[in-house]
């Protein structure tokens, strides 16, 4: 059997990225320096094996590829979740997300992290 273990993304400001993902509901695990001199932080969502690895490198400029689509998280109550994020100062898009939820079965919204990575939010029961 094969398991999806983690996703690594490069970040320009480790503390800003950690703070952003903590606001999304991730929990911070280990932080360490790699042998190559990178700073690493490991974040996870409770109940998930898959984790997010943030990597800051003194020798690398972060540039999110234009064609990188997004990662996605699932929440039980997307309206309450998005309200919480907006109250914390995180922009939810598209801008009319609340109106879009009044019709159709699929409820989704997006946020953008400090480096430009998109995170899709889907309602899942």
Placement of each model-derived feature along the sequence:
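Core segments of cupin and vicinal oxygen chelate
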Residues: 1-2, 8-49
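Vicinal oxygen chelate
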Residues: 3-13, 31-32, 41-44, 61-125, ...
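A short alpha-helix capping/helix-coil boundary motif
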Residues: 21, 59-62, 91
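Generic beta-structure capping elements
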Residues: 46, 55-57, 124
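Arg/Lys-rich, alpha-helical DNA-contact motif
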Residues: 48-52, 63
């Amino acid at each position: 059997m094969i398991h999806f273990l983690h996703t690594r993304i490069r970040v320009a400001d480790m503390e800003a990225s950690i703070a952003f993902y903590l606001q999304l509901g991730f929990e911070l695990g280990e932080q360490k320096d790699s042998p190559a001199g990178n700073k690493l932080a490991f974040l996870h969502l409770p109940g998930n094996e898959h984790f997010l690895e943030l990597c800051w490198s003194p020798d690398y400029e972060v540039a999110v590829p234009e064609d990188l689509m997004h990662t996605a998280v699932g929440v039980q109550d997307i309206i309450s979740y998005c309200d919480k994020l907006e109250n914390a100062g995180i922009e939810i898009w598209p801008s009319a997300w609340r109106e879009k939820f009044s019709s159709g079965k699929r409820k989704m919204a997006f946020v953008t992290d400090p480096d430009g990575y998109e995170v899709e939010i889907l309602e899942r029961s």
